């Protein structure tokens, strides 16, 4: 476990993120819960906690600096990614975690109780049925950025942003014709030798 903590500290340093030992312990406790539940409920395709460290924890932390304001909705959160990871980092920020799969929301309610994460609100619903105002609408669940935008565009205002976490395949052809500001960032995930990108969508003022 000390080796894993050292790896987290190194990743935090590379990402220029300040975190306490308590937060590091919370991230590890979260991954242990995810690994445990995964054996029964198939929460994520990644089974090994060492691999989760990089592909889940560090991947989520790599977008932390792009989070603005004080409220975020994580669309298709699954096992809580990136929402739970970011909620631990930003305890004053409110995270609404949305998924249509009941067992995943049941897991997140367990995470909330086990880690005393009072700034997460897991909701078992479809995103198109949700209403509310959020500073950030984030997801790493969609294969298509177009689909993400279509399902979540009712949240987008002149004062917030949508963030799509993507691998190499960037599909947003249909967005180019809309009245939107679209910015693409190449994301470096510590210990991961793979292309990661973040697409930020805002309304043009």
UniProtKB/Swiss-Prot annotation:
Domain of life: Bacteria
GO MF entries: rRNA (guanine-N7-)-methyltransferase activity
EC number in record: 2.1.1.170
Subcellular location: Cytoplasm
GO cellular component: cytosol
InterPro entries named in the record: rRNA_ssu_MeTfrase_G, SAM-dependent_MTases_sf
TM annotation in the entry: none
Binding site for S-adenosyl-L-methionine: 76, 81, 127-128, 140
SUPFAM superfamilies found in the cross-reference section: S-adenosyl-L-methionine-dependent methyltransferases
Reaction catalyzed: guanosine(527) in 16S rRNA + S-adenosyl-L-methionine = N(7)-methylguanosine(527) in 16S rRNA + S-adenosyl-L-homocysteine
Keywords: Cytoplasm, Methyltransferase, rRNA processing, S-adenosyl-L-methionine, Transferase
Main location: cytoplasm
NCBIfam families named in the record: rsmG_gidB (TIGR00138)
Task performed by this protein: Specifically methylates the N7 position of guanine in position 527 of 16S rRNA.
PANTHER family: S-ADENOSYL-L-METHIONINE-DEPENDENT METHYLTRANSFERASES SUPERFAMILY PROTEIN
Family: Belongs to the methyltransferase superfamily. RNA methyltransferase RsmG family.
Name the record gives this protein: Ribosomal RNA small subunit methyltransferase G
Source organism of this protein record: Francisella tularensis subsp. tularensis (strain WY96-3418)
């Amino acid at each position: 476990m000390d080796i894993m903590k050292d790896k987290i500290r190194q990743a935090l340093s590379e990402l220029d993120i300040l975190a306490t030992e308590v937060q590091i312990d919370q991230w590890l406790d979260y991954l242990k819960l995810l690994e445990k539940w995964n054996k029964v409920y198939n929460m994520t395709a990644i089974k090994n906690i060492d691999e989760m460290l990089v592909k889940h924890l560090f991947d989520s932390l790599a977008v932390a600096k792009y989070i603005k304001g004080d409220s975020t909705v994580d669309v298709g959160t699954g096992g809580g990614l990136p929402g739970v990871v970011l909620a631990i980092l930003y305890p004053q920020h409110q995270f609404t975690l949305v998924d249509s799969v009941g067992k995943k929301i049941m897991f997140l309610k367990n995470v909330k109780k086990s880690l005393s994460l009072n700034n997460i609100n897991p909701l078992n619903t479809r995103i198109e049925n949700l209403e509310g105002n959020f500073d950030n609408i984030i997801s790493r669940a969609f294969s298509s950025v177009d689909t993400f935008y279509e399902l979540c565009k009712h949240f987008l205002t002149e004062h917030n942003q949508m963030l799509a976490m993507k691998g190499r395949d960037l599909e947003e052809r249909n967005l180019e014709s809309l009245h939107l500001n679209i910015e693409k960032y190449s994301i470096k995930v510590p210990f991961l030798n793979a292309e990661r990108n973040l697409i930020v969508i805002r309304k043009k003022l």
